[in-house]
Amino acid sequence: MKKRCLITGGAGFIGSHLAEELVKRGHPVTIVDNFYKGKSKYHEELTGNIPIIPISILDKNSMHELVNQHDVVFHLAAILGVKTTMEKSIELIETNFDGTRNILQAALKGKKKVIFASTSEVYGKGTPPFSEDDDRLYGATSKIRWSYAICKTLEETLCLGYALQGLPVTIVRYFNIYGPRAKDGPYAGVIPRFIRAALQGDDLLVYGDGKQTRCFTYVSDAVEATIAAMDEKVNGEIINIGSEDEKSIQEVAQDIHQLTHSSSKIVHVPFEKVYPHGFEEIPNRKPDVTKLKEMCQFHPNVSWEQGLKETIQWFREIEND
């Protein structure tokens, strides 16, 4: 059955890929996005004549009206990123929590399905692999880098509270998604930052010793898993979306350096030279994807090398525009 889908943050990295895939599958899609970080060239790439409504999720009346016009809400809109968290923690907490509350309040009236985009950050300083029901351990309140994780945890709790009131909601926790259209500015994730540097001949800056590990998931795989969360059998569930393939940040830099045939150097930089006071690095982050496999019958399709090549190619193309 085709569903009318509303995607908050749908002009962003994951949201834009999700919108296009839903349209391909025959679902009518509407995007809500306030272009918090500005418009990018890739917004011109969006296919399928998808309407984009440029409003904030804090606009309660507009969001209530839009939610009621749709069957499913993919709530991806958020202020995010470690550096943004460090510099704009108040704005982040107020926007993310209040926006999510607006969505849930609107959805409850008509029992609209909500897929809430959370993050692997909520696992804090625990020991991987992280399972959805694991306890959390965060740093001291003075460590501002945890404000995003704590806010997302509170939003998850709010989602589950609404689930107890009968709202069909599923929480998905993303683990390091990468691919074409990923942000490549000063607040970029490590992969787009490395690719941009490699293509421009700049140093690839590895923070710390580079031994910290992450599990990277190509965006089309993340989208496939997110769409699977529409199924009513995962209502009220929390599901990790990620890969089990661990890579050290040093390995990531080396692989990108090799695939781009770059003349750049790989340079190590202490964390304290990059982030303000209150930063705390997480050495390892790996998901337990048992629930993803069993409840969503999902397995990644895109290999690490293939995903990197496609991402690099996209960055080459926008460099030449």
Swiss-Prot record:
NAD(+) binds at residues 12-14, 33-34, 36, 38, 76, 95, 117, 148, 152. Belongs to the NAD(P)-dependent epimerase/dehydratase family. It comes from the Bacteria. Pfam families: Epimerase. Decarboxylase involved in the biosynthesis of the nucleotide-sugar UDP-N-acetylxylosamine (UDP-XylNAc). Catalyzes the NAD-dependent decarboxylation of UDP-N-acetylglucosaminuronic acid (UDP-GlcNAcA) to UDP-XylNAc. Cannot use other UDP-uronates, such as UDP-glucuronic acid (UDP-GlcA) and UDP-galacturonic acid (UDP-GalA). The keyword NAD applies. This is UDP-N-acetyl-alpha-D-glucosaminuronate decarboxylase. Its EC number is 4.1.1.128. The active site is at 148 (proton acceptor). Homodimer. Optimum temperature is 37 degrees Celsius. Cannot use NADP(+) instead of NAD(+). One of its GO terms (biological process) is D-xylose metabolic process. It catalyses: UDP-2-acetamido-2-deoxy-alpha-D-glucuronate + H(+) = UDP-N-acetyl-alpha-D-xylosamine + CO2. Activity is completely inhibited by NADH but not by NADPH. Optimum pH is 8.2. No activity is observed below pH 4. PANTHER family: UDP-GLUCURONIC ACID DECARBOXYLASE 1, UDP-GLUCURONIC ACID DECARBOXYLASE-RELATED. One of its GO terms (cellular component) is cytoplasm. Its cofactor is NAD(+).
